[in-house]
């Protein structure tokens, strides 16, 4: 049970994400609430890893894996730090998600509810 990647030529080729992910028929939707690192603090890369690990923990608890995630929304408090951290963030992504790149939206926000949190990640997965 795999997603069909949808990247229309008119939108240009994405890097590290996909424009669309068509869910397989008969899949069950799992909505993962926004997750922050277990101990917010430290840098964006460390917090990103912690938040993504928690997202994956929920997906695994429901019987899925990274390949079942079709969409992620990432909230950051500092867009410039995100842009300056693309290489190490890509390394974290590949370590935790492999070469699976869901559709992704990144939003800069003024603050997150969790004090000292620099990033929060929510996801939607489609499980067999």
Which residues does each predicted region cover?
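N-terminal presequence-like segments and the immediate start of the first folded domain
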Residues: 1-70, 76-128
